Amino acid sequence: MPSAFVHSRSSTARSGGEAMETFLNAFRDGYARVAGARERWDDAQKASTALLGAVVNAFERMPALERGATREDVLGNDEFGKRVVEAQYASLDRLFTRLREECDEFERLTRELERAKTDAWMRTRNLTPPPKRAGGERAGPQPSIAECVLGLEDVWRMHRDECALKREIVKQAATCEDVEDLKVLHRLYCAQPNLDPEELRTIMDRVPVKSVEADLHR
């Protein structure tokens, strides 16, 4: 085989790999944004789970407070007992207000994930020349374009569904009158059934996010 032909093929393969690396660098930026959004999601999950837990505790105390409010020998006088119950209901209102605010934060984060997914699709559609095999071809150890894009799509879809579930749970909890039903809602909220931790970890490992330290030493 002529050496010039071998050199040509080698150069073409090398330039193709470099082009793919450049293209994947753009995806790394998208994955970095997704990683940041997911960290804020975890923070919102911790805060809102605690709030819903406080709602459960307040509901558990409410029957005893209402019974005590009708007995002067327990709380001293009837008016004081009523004020205690009213204060507890006011506290519940504040808790649900904060829960709705956390749901708003989940929706904002879901929109961020949607933008990352949409940007990835647009970047792929505008790629010239079009990727081979509809983006399903890998370049060495690098994930394929299709894997990168579909990963972002799956992350957005899972969080979109979980966001809708959280909103519905908070809505139902606000009108729930049975503390056991409320506990079930709380467990469902904590479980985040639409988010598969292992699948999310696999997706986020698909395109490694470059560290700040690595960028500083380039």
How does the language model describe each region?
Residues 115-218:
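Charged, alpha-helical coiled-coil and adjacent rod-like segments in eukaryotic scaffold subunits
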Residues 2, 6-54:
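N-terminal alpha-helical scaffolding segments that mark the starts
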Residues 14, 18-28, 52-154:
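Extended, amphipathic alpha-helical coiled-coil scaffold segments used for oligomerization/tethering
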